[in-house]
Regions:
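Generic beta-sheet signal
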Residues: 17-21, 61-65, 97-99
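A generic local structural motif
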Residues: 5-8, 48-53, 85-89, 120-122
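Short, conserved, surface-exposed binding loops centered on an aromatic residue
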Residues: 9-13, 36, 53-57, 91-93
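AAA+/P-loop NTPase substrate/partner-engagement loops
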Residues: 39-72
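N-terminal pre-Walker A segment at the start of P-loop NTPase domains
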Residues: 1-15
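Glycine-rich phosphate-binding P-loop
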Residues: 16-38
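SF2 helicase motor core recognition
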Residues: 28-30, 51-55, 110
Length: 221
């Protein structure tokens, strides 16, 4: 803790990697993110509400914000140790290198949810685009991959190069994982309607239950 406090007090630079991943629900983006961060102590937050970072510890090297907003985003995405909240007490210091956001929303809409302006010329919005690798999960179940839409441009050239190298390694593991995820998912797909009709024909059901079951699976819903 004292080392973390010293970094905060002396504003020691950190090569922080901020990655935003936009994708539809159930595409495996959070699972692939966790695998790409394997070996790093990671705090996983989501579900709305306050106190998201109350469990944050100095030993956390990564944070995954899963379909949720991120408080104090300007500081959390900066290249220095920071405090998680804007309050005085019970405010944990974070000196980790990875801030990953997974969302069903595009980046600009997510920023708006976090309290930023929707105007492109807003200085804080520009700062976010310079700090984040903005990505999207593209393709179908058989060929999903993480596609880079906007690279991070923050810092000196050598910092940008190292940050890009780190991102590319993250992207490689992410893509390997998400493709395996979809392959495994397709092998485990279960058609409940087909199973029941094959093993327990509708003739064995009372009429009312037969109608209810048929409507439940009507049109693939």
């Amino acid at each position: 803790m004292r080392g973390c406090q010293k970094k905060f007090d002396e504003r020691v630079p950190i090569l922080r990697k901020c990655i935003f991943i936009h994708g539809a629900p159930n595409t495996g983006k959070t699972y692939a993110t966790e695998r790409a961060l394997a070996g790093r102590k990671t705090l996983h937050v989501g579900g709305g509400g306050t106190g998201k970072f109350d469990s944050l510890k100095p030993s956390h090297d990564a944070i995954i914000v899963d379909d949720d907003v991120c408080p104090n985003l300007l500081n959390m995405s900066d290249n220095y140790s920071c405090k998680a909240y804007r309050r005085g007490r019970n405010n944990p210091i974070w000196a980790g290198e990875w801030l990953i956001v997974t969302s069903n929303l595009p980046f600009r809409e997510w920023l708006f949810k976090c309290g930023f302006s929707y105007k492109e010329e807003d200085s804080h919005v520009k700062a976010m685009f310079s700090r984040f690798f903005v990505c999207k999960v593209v393709g179908d179940d058989s060929s999903a991959e993480l596609y880079l839409l906007n690279p991070s441009t923050r810092g000196l050239v050598e910092e940008q190069k190292q940050r890009m190298r780190d991102f590319l390694q993250f992207q490689k593991v992410f893509n390997d994982t998400i493709q395996n995820y979809h392959a495994e998912k397709s092998r485990n797909d279960f058609d409940a309607f087909a199973f029941v009709t094959n093993h327990c024909p509708f003739g064995d059901f009372p009429e009312r239950q037969k109608k209810a079951f048929a409507s439940l699976y009507d049109n693939g819903s």
